[in-house]
């Protein structure tokens, strides 16, 4: 018989830097799971991606055990890294903070493809291009 799911918690944590301090401690502690066990396992799994934010979806079961999956970094972070900026535009419709090429857009779309609701790479590119536009990043 399958275990009964108690909760699903979604967190965005810097890769390799999970610790029991907020926001991880309170989010997981209220469900009674081993926070240090999660932190160690997360840090091992994301050690190769240090410096990026990696979302994790933690499934917590009634017997206080847990499983988690890591996803690809947020599209906004990948776009900021590709454009070489620290933040998007405050007024994206009026000011452009950076320009990225179609090649960079395709590269980001291929990385994000498994997490996006797109049938093909062109659909994924359009989704990422919309995110870029809302951040004030122009695609040429």
Swiss-Prot record:
SMART domains with a match to the protein in the record: RL11
GO biological process: translation
Alphabetic keyword roster: Methylation, Ribonucleoprotein, Ribosomal protein, RNA-binding, rRNA-binding
Covalent S-S links between cysteines: none
Protein modification: One or more lysine residues are methylated.
GO molecular function terms noted in the UniProt entry: large ribosomal subunit rRNA binding; structural constituent of ribosome
GO annotations of cellular component type: cytosolic large ribosomal subunit
Record note on quaternary structure: Part of the ribosomal stalk of the 50S ribosomal subunit. Interacts with L10 and the large rRNA to form the base of the stalk. L10 forms an elongated spine to which L12 dimers bind in a sequential fashion forming a multimeric L10(L12)X complex.
Record-stated family: Belongs to the universal ribosomal protein uL11 family.
Function: Forms part of the ribosomal stalk which helps the ribosome interact with GTP-bound translation factors.
HAMAP family linked to this entry: Ribosomal_uL11
Stated name of the protein: Large ribosomal subunit protein uL11
Gene encoding the protein: rplK
């Amino acid at each position: 018989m399958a275990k009964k799911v108690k909760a699903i918690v979604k967190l965005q944590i810097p890769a390799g830097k999970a610790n029991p301090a907020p926001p991880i401690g309170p989010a997981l502690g209220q469900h009674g799971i081993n926070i240090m066990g999660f932190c160690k396992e997360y840090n091992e799994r994301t050690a190769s991606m240090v410096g990026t934010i990696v979302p994790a979806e933690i499934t917590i079961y009634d017997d206080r055990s847990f499983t988690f999956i890591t996803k690809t970094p947020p599209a906004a972070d990948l776009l900021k890294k590709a454009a070489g900026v620290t933040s998007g535009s405050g007024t994206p419709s009026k000011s452009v903070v950076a320009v990225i090429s179609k090649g960079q857009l395709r590269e980001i779309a291929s990385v994000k493809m498994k997490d996006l609701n797109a049938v093909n790479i062109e659909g994924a590119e359009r989704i990422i291009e919309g995110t870029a536009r809302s951040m004030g990043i122009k695609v040429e």
